[in-house]
Amino acid sequence: MVLQLCKYVPYYEQGGVLIEVSPMLRVPRTFRTFSAMMAQCLTKLKVRAATGSATLLNVVKNPLRDHLPLGIKLIGTSSKAALKPMSEYVAQFSPQGTPEHFKSICYVIGAVSVGNPGMENDFEIDESICIASQGLSAACVCSKVCMAYEQHWGIL
């Protein structure tokens, strides 16, 4: 069984631009290369891979809900929302404990450890949660979310 957990990765920029990020994208290590890539995306509306014709970044029309499956639940992360342990929170979306019974959800994660991206955006969030009592980086939040699903499904 092949289960694709990462089907769609949108990036919502502060200026209101919605960018589709391919899961195949390897983010550049230096800021200079990253800023050149983002500038190319915003001017040419897409960034293609150097080898092949795969599109790595693509500017898409707003709103975000138009690009997500029907019935998907949007969950925002915020430091001001109710604190919920991820292990208990994840269990409600996959009650049988297997990926086959998984409900479609989308997490809205901010790129900085301060602020409330789950509450400060232009699209409607179904629920906001706080997964730690202190501010976390986006990488740490993504890691905590993935680890919670791995533990719930018994992936070692």
What do these predicted regions represent?
Residues 1-87, 95, 150-155:
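RNA substrate-binding interface of SAM-dependent RNA methyltransferases
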Residues 31-34, 93, 102, 123:
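Phenylalanine-focused residue identity feature
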Residues 68-69, 99-102, 121-123:
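Intrinsically disordered, low-complexity regulatory regions enriched in Ser/Pro/Gly/Thr
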